[in-house]
Amino acid sequence: FHGVDNEGNSLNGFPILLEGNNADIWGSAVADDIDNDGEIEFVISSKNKHCYIIDQYGNIELDFESEHFLMATPSLANLDSDNDLEIIMYSYSSSGDIYAINHNGTNVPNFPVNINEKILKGGAIYDLNNNGKDDIVVATENDDLIAIIYDDGTISNLFTGSDKFKTVPSIINNNGEIIIVAGNEDGFYYGVNLDGSLKFTVVTGGSIHSSSGFVEFNNQLGIFFGSEDGYLYGIDINGNALPGWPQNISGDSTENRINSSPVFADLNNDQIPEVITASEEGLI
């Protein structure tokens, strides 16, 4: 696990070599002041079945061992009534264990839960039932589900897609209307209401492994995602294509699949955000 400064030099205490077999880090690190000590901690999970809390000096504050591969990016959420953040881990196993622990490694009440579904990339966090506590949304491989795990461990299977989900879902609050979006292996990008009904479907020509990116411009929310058909898609909150979208960045190549999530910046100071993504062929 690497920590570098703005010139690419390793920070003191980094890199950290994880121990054990299969110590690959597939997901991203997440960071916050988990225990309210005034310092930022990093959380990473690994295929070696461990999750680590690491401080900004490279010290491992917690090494939590699970029973399953932890391939997905962990999440931070407030699942209970204290002021500390809890750590959520997603197992890549047929039992579909979802762990939630405190910063000292103890389990959050009612966790872990088993959803009997493999989760590859991670989950989304939001208070869906307005009780002041966060809930978890995941998209799964086995039965092609979008599911909600509420703060008390209750599971609600919200929607069944046409094929496996291998991406992280996203949650949109559109003036009080909750929409969950995710793409699947069939190339379908779904917008799902909180009651499980479909708000929209966008059909692409390839599998969708890209998580969604969001940008607001001219008082309108733009939703962007890539597909393995080589197109970058831009849609509005109703699933309609934005003017000028989708954009084909693959040309005649069959290798320019877009599996990276888009990011946004006003690169030329014209008050219009640019969309930045990367292709599997190595193009930005």
Residue ranges of model-derived segments:
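Extracytoplasmic/lumenal domain signature
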Residues: 1-284
